[in-house]
Amino acid sequence: MSASTKRKRDQAEESVPAENPASTDVEKAIKPAQKQEEETSFVDLGLDPRLLQAIAQQKFAKPTLVQRKAIPLALNGQDVLAKADCGSGKTAAYVLPLLSSILKRKATDSTAFTTALILVPTRELADQVSKAIEQFASFCAKDISTAKLTDKVSSKVQRALLSNSPDIVISTPSTAWQNVNSSALSIDKLTHLILDEADLVLSYGYSEDLENLSRSVPKGVQVMMMSATLSDEVDTLKGIFRRDPTLLDLKEKEAEGEGITQFVAKCGEDEKFLLAYVIFKLKLIKGKCIIFVSDIDRCYRLKLFFEQFGIRSCILNSELPLNSRVHVVEEFNRHVYDIIIAADEKNEMLGDDEEPAETAEAQDDAKKSNEGDDAETEAKRPKKKAKKSKGGDKEYGVSRGVDFKKVSAVINFDLPTTASAYTHRIGRTARAGQTGMALSFVVPKDLYRKHMPTSTPACENDEKIMARIIRQQAKRDKEVKPYNFNMKQVDPFRYRMNDALRAVTKVAIREARTRELRQELLKSEKLKRYFEENPTELSHLRHDGELRTARQQAHLKHIPEYLMPKDGKQALTEDVGFVAMRKDKKGKGKKGRGFKVGSRKRDPLKTFKARRKTK
């Protein structure tokens, strides 16, 4: 090495700035702490050993972020308000510390009284919470008693359920207050009050019931509120219960490539059905899928439309009995059904939780546009409260809280009316660190009302709503990508779509609703009585049968080869299954009707000699 080269190297080394020892020490201290927190196990959280056994039985590897943060606070008796993503484990975050505290108390005091009241907005969520408690308490079932008040039973039955003072009561606010007011439920010694999906509890019109309950609960009760969004409703709840809880605004770190991939497709109202037909008939989406529509009629229109093409699906809406709804979700989670068509009738109750600055920006844009008055009215419109539906279960809810497992895709056949409802809909997929896809159909303003048989008022403001959704997702560093179908390949299927839509008339939809409701009521009674004694028979009860109220055309169930796109052929014919034309001809004729040996030798068409008659 030359002297000049060595001199340059020495100068370069001297010019490198020295590390700040203080900053280095801080970084070294922070990184191990973060790593240690991420490696925290359920054992480190200080839970009861029996709960740890149940956790191990369910094969939970380690606690999620919301569980790591909320459980220690809850065990210390602090009030908690936790905001975490859908599918992040919020239920376990309050159930585990609750069970642990009950077991700790019962070790020294065996007095029976209601310790905890869990308030939920919907019957479906109540059933899910009840099952979660049952699973986590599997090794201490004798020490934990639970009562679920959301089943449709008489007040006498509810009073009987509460007569033994169960440790935990799960209910909607209205039912809870009715029982407290009638003295069937005593909450004088209540120690825990939990609100799951806290923002939705208020949006469903339970404000008066919550006010009454807040005046009845003891002063020292511990309050826990869980939600996937932080909106004004949550602030209202804090005021109702006069609490200042520890706020946990949490977001799990996503691994690279994980999460939800969001797409939007602009199309006409009739083209929604065309694209849905192509997607499911050509199997462009693999795995289980939830399709959200705006009302019950749309549920049956889409189901009857799918029936024309032999596409099996089942329905979820507020008209169906609770037992049937719960069973549909359970069977869907067990991979019995692949497609659920869900009526999200209450998504309009949630006001948009966008920031005031964004609302002002929307108002400014609205003033500049030709539609200034309408858009400004939309921006200033107050949040809607629960609307009383003419029929159906007012405590029904499918887009919030319900734990659909391993859902590959969510399709917003009808776009929700708020960006908040959109967030919760797409939260049904990509749960617990999995991946998923969300596809939304948007009807442009110039295509609205162009096809009256399939038109619905819910599509009137699709473009405005999607603009808000895109802004909200951008704040979360999420992108809603355009999904452009190759309409040249899709158009050949249009005439088949038109044939199927013509068959799905209003009369057919009305008859389908009546028939489905009658069938599900019968199934619900069976689920309630017979299947309690014969649980193994439950798997034979299906909910995806054909309604057959629309005129069906057999040829629509099969796709002619000339209609198939070139790229779609291979994907469609991979799993063809048994085809008679390809059967091996060896051994043909060995089964079935027999024939006499030698008959071929006496073929009259070849020999012109008829066979002699035998006497």
Swiss-Prot record:
Q: From the UniProt record, list the coiled-coil ranges.
A: none
Q: Which residues form the Helicase ATP-binding domain?
A: 71-248
Q: Where is the Helicase C-terminal domain?
A: 259-491
Annotated Basic and acidic residues bias: 25-37
Q: Name one GO cellular component term.
A: cytosol
Biological process terms in GO annotation:
rRNA processing
- Tell me the compartments it is located in: Nucleus, Nucleolus
Detail the disulphide connectivity of this chain as listed in its UniProt entry: none
The UniProt keyword set, sorted, is: ATP-binding, Helicase, Hydrolase, Nucleotide-binding, Nucleus, Ribosome biogenesis, RNA-binding, rRNA processing
> Motif span (DEAD box)?
196-199
Q: Write down the EC number.
A: 3.6.4.13
Q: Which reaction does it catalyse?
A: ATP + H2O = ADP + phosphate + H(+)
Q: Which GO terms describe its molecular function?
A: ATP binding; ATP hydrolysis activity; RNA binding; RNA helicase activity
Q: Which SMART domains match?
A: DEXDc (SM00487), HELICc (SM00490)
Ranges annotated as biased composition (Acidic residues): 351-363
Residues of the region (Disordered) are 1-37, 351-396, 583-615
- The UniProt annotation places ATP binding at 84-91
As annotated in the record, motif Q motif runs over 40-68
Q: What class of enzyme is it?
A: hydrolase
Biased region (Basic residues) positions are: 583-594
What this chain does, per the entry, is described as: ATP-binding RNA helicase involved in the biogenesis of 60S ribosomal subunits and is required for the normal formation of 25S and 5.8S rRNAs.
Family affiliation: Belongs to the DEAD box helicase family. DDX56/DBP9 subfamily.
Q: What is known of its domains?
A: The Q motif is unique to and characteristic of the DEAD box family of RNA helicases and controls ATP binding and hydrolysis.
Q: What is this protein called?
A: ATP-dependent RNA helicase DBP9
Q: Which gene encodes it?
A: DBP9
